[in-house]
Amino acid sequence: MERVGAGELPETLRLARPGAMVAFAKQDAVAEGYGPAARAAREHGFQPILRLAGGRAAVFHEGTMALAHAIPDHDPRPGIQRRFEQSAELVARALRRLGVDARVGGVPGEYCPGGYSVNVAGERKLAGIGQRLIKDAAHVGAVVVATGEERIRDVLVPVYEALGLSWRPATAGSAGTPLDELQAALSAEYAELYELVEWRLDEKTLALARRHRAEHLAG
């Protein structure tokens, strides 16, 4: 995102398969129960990290797809809602390609609640979307759950209890589709809007990521 904002890279989309992490938001990090919540994550085999954007703690694991879209924009604030709407609908369309009854909107009692969550049949959350703005760029981040909703429930029950947050574990869902198929569907939807050119992270970008790593390590 920083390199896109600086004009060093063009608009960039990254689809990644993360390890097991609980991504805490800034307001989680200042909560009284943050320490116990981070310990609960570790006890369940999840690395606690601090996230770039989003409202409350969310989960990444090997059955999820992480999406990061860095967009150059000299005045990013007026476009916040448009980016949310476009990104949420794009994820929903990708899931519908796979036969999922995907809809945009929050589910009552969902974890990390948001108006631009993507759900299945209005009942279970499949994806969450967040944004971060910097000078001359916006970052849209999302996590889409392909499989393994039970792992989300198992770790977030103690994590949210420690943070003093209420939620309904039954709202955690998954698309029930292989990651390869989910990645292909997401790529196909982005290809409808953009000319996609495959690119691998270069050394300058990796070095920048290493410098920022400590900022995202949870206590």
Feature annotation, model-predicted:
Residues 52-58:
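Short glycine-enriched loops at secondary-structure junctions
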Residues 18, 62, 120-123, 134-135, ...:
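Short acidic-glycine loop/turn motifs at beta-strand connectors
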Residues 104-125, 205-208:
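Beta-rich nucleic-acid/ligand-interaction surfaces
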Residues 32-35, 76-80, 151-155, 179-181:
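Short, conserved charged micro-motifs
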Residues 98-100, 129-132, 136-219:
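Long, positively charged amphipathic alpha-helical accessory segments at protein N-termini or as interdomain linkers
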Residues 16-18, 60-72, 164-172:
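Residues forming anionic-ligand binding surfaces in small-molecule and nucleic-acid pockets
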Residues 63-108:
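Contiguous, small/hydrophobic- and glycine-enriched helical/loop subdomains that border
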